[in-house]
């Protein structure tokens, strides 16, 4: 296995599985920390702040810092503030998205006369929230969604994800949003900018082919698939573009790096 100068790392299915630890995850991060190898946690989760993400990782005995976390909410806020500083925004979403938008100097309004509509996962979404978003998009607001995941794994099973919520507005208006999170390149390009390295020096680590592995492929970096989450080894064998590597777990990756 190639020795990369830095890694972009998925969370659920790679670092942990729901509320369960994944063997090899904490050990892999310890290996990176001990060898001073930069890494960022890249997540489509828009509901949590980097501090909250870090708290979850530490519960899993993973030594992480908030400045190592790139959420789809952060990437969305940065993207809008670069395009249109001080823009007005109507948002559907959670605490993580609201915090990211306001920290970026954007003004959140509760009506349909805004510059942008931003949709992130909102477990308390209502018909009225979707109505305001729909009217704002029809009025000409730019339409952005933090990520396209149509379902998310929960203890009860797979529940509606942000892509499902977003689809209500896109179907109603006939306008497709710009997605920020994986597998799109915006969140990945932001992460690469933070690292400041060449693409050939960075690898994406994740379990889900359509999201994690494709995000690496789309942005032009190598990919490391771990068989600890959703996509199995058999699944990835049928793909037109396979990951650069596929390992049973991150313990195997450590063993490869220590050769």
Swiss-Prot record:
Keyword set, alphabetical order: Hydrolase, Magnesium, Metal-binding
Cofactors named for this entry: Mg(2+)
GO molecular function: metal ion binding; phosphatase activity
Lineage: superkingdom: Bacteria
CDD domains hit by this protein: HAD_Pase_UmpH-like
A Pfam family reported for this protein in Swiss-Prot or TrEMBL: Hydrolase_6
Entry's EC annotation: 3.1.3.-
One Gene Ontology cellular component: cytoplasm
NCBIfam families noted in UniProt: HAD-SF-IIA (TIGR01460), HAD-SF-IIA-hyp2 (TIGR01457)
Family of the protein in this entry: Belongs to the HAD-like hydrolase superfamily. NagD family.
Chain's role: Catalyzes the dephosphorylation of 2-6 carbon acid sugars in vitro.
Designated name of the protein: Acid sugar phosphatase
Organism: Staphylococcus epidermidis (strain ATCC 35984 / DSM 28319 / BCRC 17069 / CCUG 31568 / BM 3577 / RP62A)
Lineage: Bacteria, Bacillati, Bacillota, Bacilli, Bacillales
